[in-house]
Amino acid sequence: MESFRQIKNNNVDLISNNDPLDKNRLLIEDLWESVLREECPDDQAERLIQLKELSYSKQMNGDSSKTFKNEIVDIVNSMDLAESIAAARAFSLYFQLVNILEQRVEEDRYIQSFTNKDVQKSHDNLDPFAPALARQNAPVTFRELFYRLRKLNVPPGKLEELLQEMDIRLVFTAHPTEIVRHTIRHKQTRVANLLKKIQIEQFLTKEEKNSLKNQLKEEVRLWWRTDELHQFKPSVLDEVDYALHYFQQVLFNAMPQLRGRIAEALTENYPDVQLPSQSFCNFGSWVGSDRDGNPSVTPEITWRTACYQRQLMLERYIIATSNLRDQLSVSMQWSQVSSSLLESLETDRVKFPEIYEARATRYRSEPYRLKLSYILEKLRLTQERNNLLSDNGWKFDLEGEIDNKNLDKVENLYYKSVNEFTYDLELIKNSLISTGLTCESVNTLLTQVHIFGFSLASLDIRQESTRHSDAIQELTNYLDLTMKYDQMSEEEKIKWLIDELNTKRPLIPSDVNWTKTTEETFSVFKMVKRLQQEFGSRICHSYVISMSHSASDLLEVLLLAKEMGLLDQNSQKSKLLVVPLFETVEDLKRAPEVMERLFKLDFYRSLLPKVGESFKPLQELMLGYSDSNKDSGFVSSNWEIHRAQIALQNLSSRNNILLRLFHGRGGSVGRGGGPAYQAILAQPSGTLKGRIKITEQGEVLASKYSLPELALYNLETVTTAVIQNSLVNNRLDATPEWNQLMSRLAETSRSHYRKLVHENPDLLNFFQEVTPIEEISKLQISSRPARRKKGAKDLSSLRAIPWVFGWTQSRFLLPSWFGVGTALSSELNSDPRQIELLRVLHQRWPFFRMLISKVEMTLSKVDLEVARYYVDTLGSRENKDSFDDIFEVISKEYNLTKSLILEITGKNKLLESDRDLKLSVSLRNKTIIPLGFLQVSLLRRLRDQTRQPPISEFIIDKDESRRAYSRSELLRGALLTINGIAAGMRNTG
């Protein structure tokens, strides 16, 4: 094997013999080659290894890229289908092994940073203000952050005030659903655990290390023989199960440690500052409740999702309570017990005589064990009731569809709310404390209960705005209003909606057969009311309106909520927090105007929930990164979101309203993704104030939450960034000259982007032909359609996720950078001296630095020679000239952008200041080349199948008897390459 070792020999400065990442890459490559040699025929294994080595060695030896890539193309095109599938699987396996390794090393580095008590001293000489903090690419730990804040003379009272108000919400989503199967994820976890054991080699004997390596090989060989592709399109409940896996396996046990680490860091630096609330960091979910464009998410599905979440929590609490019962063997012969606990035991004895008879003799002198036996019974009865509710659906009590005897038998015995469970645990805790004892396990369980409750995560409802206006249109047509609703102006709509909101009579007749769509819209609100009755308001409180354009969009939802009993007119309280989602650039620009109209409405203001010690009204507002980027490009999207935040915060402050911004960030840069720490630091000064809500996309869950320390690292990163942004204000956002410059860059970039993407009539054909977009839509990875409207083929109907996915697979990555070079060039052409200002912005302004950093990282992954091959091979003959023109525009913009990014950053090469990232991207770029050519080969064969006669000259199979491969077999091969490239690029859409 020469690949990684060759790079080691040729890049002494880049590779370290002592670095665990470098060291274990050799282990991974040896493992990969060993598995191939045992699982594939000899000639096939050697050919696959040769193919990977060719990518490394030819570039390392200085061969021209065109020459060695032609060699790869020749090898790929000579493969039959069986060999092609083996190659796709092999490269996919390789990249997934590398991903696991990098996650493991990242986890170890976090552990090291947490346990190294001297780490903060390296930052003593940092300029503590924004410029220096902006230069820190690496996230800081709580210990480092509090040490810095102390050096900055941040008053303890100011820090404590922020911590008490801190509210961090991470919302798991299912779009895109992670492309890797759940079964494969389990195998990856086992591989990660074995790697972890191997990495402590200094404590292992030679025999133990060899045994672990053999186990590792066995696991990977089993993985090789497991199907990577979903055999069926996952249902919404499958996606729910996938997302909740991370709560079950990692987050349930990890979350209590997060607050513990804050406590330790405060003790060292701010010993008198109180800890934040136990639930300062909590979770939400869209999985099973986001119905925007997904007809599979019905009211019944959302109900079953809530029941499933409660089932998982009850299972965890039963296990934890059972463990507590084993642990708390305190005897009354040797310890006092509080009178409150003894009184509760007497009450429980009356309610649960069977438990008393079964346990009293065994635990007659062990009150804690007896109390925990009663708690276990209550949890089991709660679980039994939950199963009945899940099985019979959300309508049962409304329509009397089932016999309630089974529910009656547990009435008054189960936990009606999580508060009752908490009360029982507090009794135990306080009794222990009163007698001089403590039990960390009780404290841990209480923290888990405070964070997760019985609900696990709150479910945000999301629906597109026109669904509500269409329902009201149908309603008003039935009521035969003088003026049709869709003919009203915005002012007339607002007046009519407010009048109806203030009217106590019902508006919606109960005996009308509405259209299916309208009936389902109404049913969602009915289901939410039932959810809140059963689970409490915590389970489902936010209603997100996608594609919000106007004030009436929010008032329509409030009117429907009122009609379904979710709005109390007497107390003027709403049980729903209505959250507008502004997605396009034009809507982002209009957002302050829309919200100002609403804030001026006394009725609307009165419905906002009052929070915190100040009891101020709270408005949650969501900003969409994906569609604004697809609409106007990377720079324009980010700048308009930045500006909107400042304007909305100023508006909220003037109206004495608290603002919680909900960032709809995707996994990829083209959808707002990237390092969370940098992104949060780059938020405008004064917009966070300890409150933030962020989506965690399905595709990145594994990279953030698959391992306990990795999850803690991500959570600590987000939390420290929120604290840092909130306390160390960067007032550079208010610099007029900088804002004017950014506005010009955004406008020029947007114009150039839209000229290609929206105004060039050939771009859509280009995208459909030279990327695997149509094949991506056939991947069984999500319950959600790739397009908003069934059968539509226009760009506007295509979702942002497959839009970014297609460009990523073909190595263009266009949404993440196109237009940047032209914008920068335009600025410099007007005044070459502006280069100095751009460099200052990069050094001192976190927002601009984040922008440039993301573009730089994305450019490093672009490979225009591979992209050119997609165009030449997959583009139709009749479109050759127009496609060549489009490629030339893209190529010119790439080269311009790259040169100017290097000029601004002062670098000679992309990523040269980030050694680990540069090495990771470099290795992936070299290894992924054959997979791209293989994908093109299979896509060409697949698409030729639809032509009569087929025109491809590629070999389908060397065996004459097996040449007639079906379209499904070719599709399978193509989909495997999509899997592999997604793993190699480390994201999908």
Curated annotation (Swiss-Prot):
It is an enzyme of class 4 (lyase). Pfam families: PEPcase. Signal peptide: none annotated. It catalyses: oxaloacetate + phosphate = phosphoenolpyruvate + hydrogencarbonate. Forms oxaloacetate, a four-carbon dicarboxylic acid source for the tricarboxylic acid cycle. Belongs to the PEPCase type 1 family. This is Phosphoenolpyruvate carboxylase. It comes from Prochlorococcus marinus (strain MIT 9215).
